[in-house]
């Protein structure tokens, strides 16, 4: 083929010269319009164009098939379901070179597999030949051994043949005798079964006839109705009575219904009709319905409600109560909901609630006291001695700074034996003094809370109250509180009018003020003695003591001196070196060192006793206060102290009290009333002030805890996370860090390890010695948690003079600011005829086409209200702001 030029080739292919030159360039051949093209170059261009325009290497075909499936539904209606099946297939175009390479690899793989197969066949043939040779040798050995065994067996068979014949003859004879006995027994059983079946059939027929006659005549059953028989045969009568008892027993006992059913394999016991009648009488048919019978009445007498005696302990779960009443737990829960209490099946309820529920459901309740062990321990005490006169126990109360402490100091310094070395070394909280007319025991600082709790627990620890009132100050709030405590305790009051030596003293005013609260002097016809004293000068102290002894003589105070002691805890605290220490006032008996005492939730052996001077004593009689050591823990102020015989029983009683206190507490906490349920649902978030409280004595802990808990409101609550007696330890600091609480120490300090934790965790630690300062600061902390009060304040008014349309904002109100200032980012209200018709915010605030943040009084502006286009001339736009006002707790 001759060479042609680019132009000629372009004319032949009917394309432009530039495109042809570009195609040659793409194929790697550089040509111009006048250059010639050889045949080799043409072939190169054709291959390049074929490769470029060869089409896609992959072809995907998709096919969808739709069909409808009818599914039968409920109510006889069918349901149509559309089903679509999608199929997808992909074809890949292989490269010729790739196809040749794959074919070569497949051929090589087939040859390798063929070679491996031939080698495997040859190896298998060799192994089979070797195995056949081994098996032939083993077979020859086995045949030789079997031949030897057969020969030996032949010899044994000949020798034992005669013995076997003898044994077979004997066995055949025994078998024949056994078969004969079995045939005889079966014949007897068949005859007896036929007789019983006939008797039962006759009895059943008689019973049916009797029932039919009874229901037809509608007659009342008589006493001899069970003795009615329809046959004269004695055996038939017995079978009839037995059948009646079985049927009636099956009706009366639902649990023994299985016993009344016919056995599965007993086909000859009764006929098919009889078996159906028995099944219908014992249990219901399919679906709970009884199978009808033409000869049996379907009426059944309703069961009478069973009233049971329900024994209820101090606590019981709902499930246990249901089991005692033999009802379902859901019925008990329903009854509790009717009474207004929500409960679950496993919830513990108290004795009163369980009693109400059981009586509501018609049962008789027997309340059981579970403290038999405690009563047994308390009754095992030798307290049968005669009562003797005892010293009075006096509590001195009064307002702050009225000279109460000075009066006590003067009495102690003058009446305590002066020969005591070191004087009063310890402040025990109670002490006794000797006078010419007798002994008096004073309670120093019981605190009002401890005083009230002792009276509430029935501990007759206080006999007389000395009310100290300053002659120059008169009756103060705490004086009134002391009078209320004395009246609640129903104890006589002796009034000591102190500071009588001051020039401004006015004892008559004190009498007049006290008379308003029911404290009348004897000269006015009352029962209270008034004594004028001066704690500073010592005036009237002897008269006060004589008045106390006179009042005690009127009361005729007596106590048993011999026997096992009992008393009350005046104060308790935890000493770092000695452990739990309790100040005990003995009420009766004599307390000895080494006695086993039971004190509330605690118990122990008295290891040491000390009097108010800090001296060791071996015994303490009635009205004597002592410190005792050796208890298992710190008891609560006001707890009863009792001496018992056995330490093991004392421990059991203490543990029982702890567990019972916990159960009763949980039962009362879990009790939720229906009327409170919706209130609890609607309550919002309640803030809590968590406090870990430590104080020097138990009385301070109780008083501070009660005062703080009374500060709680609906929005902020005070929560005492932990409290105790003694210094602040590392455990207290860790507890405060975990619960985000405030550490409060009242007359105590934190140790070194606790201070490290407090510094590391940045805890809030506060020390106090005055309870009023503590309460004020907790109030301030609670006030900070109150949500602020929101108040709306109007800051500007704008009157709409005209309304314009804007393509961007919609209706624009042309306004004149008449009052205050209009700010862009504040909420607004639209008023029409002084009625609010819209509340929202501004979208645009302009003045002379400029966006501004505020427009003041007397200036015009354009206002665009967001999401509101119904602004009219004459409307008023009110701009306001929301102010937060911090609230405080009163």
Curated annotation (Swiss-Prot):
Changing residue 165 to I/T: Produces reduces amount of isoform beta (i.e. only beta1). Reduced growth at 37 degrees Celsius, greatly reduced growth at 30 degrees Celsius. Growth is more impaired. Residues 389-558 form the tr-type G domain. Residues 67-81 have a biased composition (Polar residues). This is Translation initiation factor IF-2. The gene is infB. PANTHER family: TR-TYPE G DOMAIN-CONTAINING PROTEIN, TRANSLATION INITIATION FACTOR IF-2-RELATED. Residues 398-405 are annotated as: G1. Disruption phenotype: Essential, it cannot be deleted. The C-terminal region (residues 165-890) is sufficient for growth at 42 degrees Celsius, although it grows more slowly at 37 degrees and is cold-sensitive at 30 degrees Celsius. Keywords: Acetylation, Cytoplasm, GTP-binding, Initiation factor, Nucleotide-binding, Protein biosynthesis. Pfam families: EF-G_D2, GTP_EFTU, GTP_EFTU_D2, IF-2, IF2_assoc, IF2_N. Component of the 30S ribosomal translation pre-initiation complex which assembles on the 30S ribosome in the order IF-2 and IF-3, IF-1 and N-formylmethionyl-tRNA(fMet); mRNA recruitment can occur at any time during PIC assembly. GO terms for biological process: chaperone-mediated protein folding; response to cold; translational initiation. Induction: Part of the metY operon that extends to pnp. Residues 1-103 are annotated as: 1.
């Amino acid at each position: 083929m001759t060479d042609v030029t680019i132009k000629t080739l372009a004319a032949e292919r009917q394309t432009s010269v530039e495109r042809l030159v570009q195609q040659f360039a793409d194929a790697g051949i550089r040509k111009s319009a006048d250059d010639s093209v050889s045949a080799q170059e043409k072939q190169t261009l054709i291959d390049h164009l074929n490769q470029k325009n060869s089409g896609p290497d992959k072809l995907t075909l998709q096919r969808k098939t739709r069909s409808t499936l009818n599914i039968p539904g409920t109510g006889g209606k069918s349901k149509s379901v559309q089903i679509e099946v999608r199929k997808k297939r992909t074809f890949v175009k292989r490269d010729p070179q790739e196809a040749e390479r794959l074919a070569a690899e497949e051929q090589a793989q087939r040859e390798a597999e063929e070679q491996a197969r031939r080698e495997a066949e040859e190896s298998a043939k060799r192994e089979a030949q070797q195995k056949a040779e081994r098996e032939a040798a083993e077979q020859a050995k086995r045949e030789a051994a079997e031949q030897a065994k057969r020969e030996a067996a032949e010899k044994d068979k000949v020798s034992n043949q005669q013995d076997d014949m003898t044994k077979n003859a004997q066995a055949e004879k025994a078998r024949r005798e056994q078969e004969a006995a079995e045939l005889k027994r079966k014949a007897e059983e068949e005859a007896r079964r036929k007789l019983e079946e006939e008797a039962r059939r006759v009895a059943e027929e008689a019973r049916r006839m009797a029932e039919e006659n009874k229901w037809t005549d509608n007659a009342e059953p008589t006493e001899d109705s069970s003795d009615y028989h329809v046959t004269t045969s004695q055996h038939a009568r017995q079978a009839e009575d037995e059948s009646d008892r079985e049927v009636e027993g099956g009706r009366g006992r639902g649990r023994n219904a299985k016993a009344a059913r016919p056995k599965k394999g007993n086909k000859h016991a009764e006929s098919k009709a009889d078996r159906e009648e028995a099944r219908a009488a014992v249990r219901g048919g399919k679906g709970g319905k009884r199978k009808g019978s033409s000869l049996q009445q379907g009426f059944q007498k309703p069961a009478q409600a069973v009233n049971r005696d329900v024994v209820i302990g101090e606590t019981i779960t709902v499930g246990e109560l249901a089991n005692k009443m033999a009802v379902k737990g859901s019925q008990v829960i329903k009854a509790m909901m009717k009474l207004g209490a929500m409960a679950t099946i496993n919830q513990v309820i108290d004795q009163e609630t369980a009693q109400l529920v059981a009586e509501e459901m018609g049962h008789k309740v027997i309340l059981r006291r579970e403290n038999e062990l405690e009563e047994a321990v308390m009754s095992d005490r030798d307290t049968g001695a005669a009562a003797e006169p005892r010293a009075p126990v006096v509590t001195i109360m009064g307002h702050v700074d009225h000279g109460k402490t000075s009066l006590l100091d003067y009495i102690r310094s003058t009446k305590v034996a002066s020969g005591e070395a070191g004087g009063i070394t310890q402040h025990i909280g109670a002490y006794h003094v000797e006078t010419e007319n007798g002994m008096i025991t004073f309670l120093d600082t019981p605190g009002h809370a401890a005083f009230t709790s002792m009276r509430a627990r029935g501990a007759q620890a206080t006999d007389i109250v000395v009310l100290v009132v300053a002659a120059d100050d008169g009756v103060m709030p705490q004086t009134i509180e002391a009078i209320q405590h004395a009246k609640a305790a129903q104890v006589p009051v002796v009034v000591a009018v102190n500071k009588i030596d001051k020039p401004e003293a006015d004892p008559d005013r004190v009498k007049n003020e006290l008379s308003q609260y029911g404290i009348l002097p004897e000269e006015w016809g009352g029962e209270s003695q008034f004594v004028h004293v001066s704690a500073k000068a010592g005036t009237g102290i002897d008269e006060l003591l004589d008045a106390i002894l006179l009042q005690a003589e009127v009361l005729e105070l007596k106590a048993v001196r011999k026997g096992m002691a009992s008393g009350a805890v005046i104060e308790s605290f935890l000493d770092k070196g000695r452990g739990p220490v309790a100040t005990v006032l003995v009420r009766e008996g004599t307390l000895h060192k080494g006695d086993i005492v039971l004190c509330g939730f605690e118990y122990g052996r008295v290891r040491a006793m000390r009097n108010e001077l800090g001296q060791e004593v071996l015994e303490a009689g009635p009205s004597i206060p002592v410190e005792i050591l050796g208890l298992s823990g710190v008891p609560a102020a006001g707890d009863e102290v009792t001496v018992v015989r056995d330490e093991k029983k004392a421990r059991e009683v203490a543990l029982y009290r702890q567990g019972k206190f916990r159960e009763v507490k949980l039962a009362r906490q879990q009790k939720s009333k229906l009327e409170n349920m919706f209130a609890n649902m609607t309550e919002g978030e309640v803030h809590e002030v968590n406090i870990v409280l430590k104080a020097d004595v138990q009385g301070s802990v109780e008083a501070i805890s009660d005062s703080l808990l009374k500060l709680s409101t609906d929005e902020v609550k005070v929560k005492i996370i932990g409290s105790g007696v003694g210094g602040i330890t590392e455990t207290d600091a860790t507890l405060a860090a975990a619960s985000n609480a405030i550490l409060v120490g009242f007359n105590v300090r934190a140790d070194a390890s606790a201070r490290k934790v407090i510094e590391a965790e940045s805890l809030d630690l506060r020390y106090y010695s005055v309870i009023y300062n503590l309460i004020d600061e907790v109030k301030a902390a609670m006030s900070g948690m109150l949500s602020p009060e929101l108040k709306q304040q109007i800051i500007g008014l704008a009157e709409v003079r005209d309304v314009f349309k804007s393509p961007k904002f919609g209706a624009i109100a042309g306004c004149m600011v008449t009052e205050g200032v209009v700010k862009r980012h504040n909420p607004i209200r639209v008023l029409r005829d002084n009625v609010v018709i819209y509340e929202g915010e501004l979208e645009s605030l302009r003045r002379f086409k400029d966006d501004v943040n505020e427009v003041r009084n007397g200036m015009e502006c354009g206002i665009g209200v967001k999401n509101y286009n119904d602004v009219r001339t004459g409307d008023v736009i009110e701009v306001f702001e929301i102010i937060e006002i911090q609230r405080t707790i009163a």
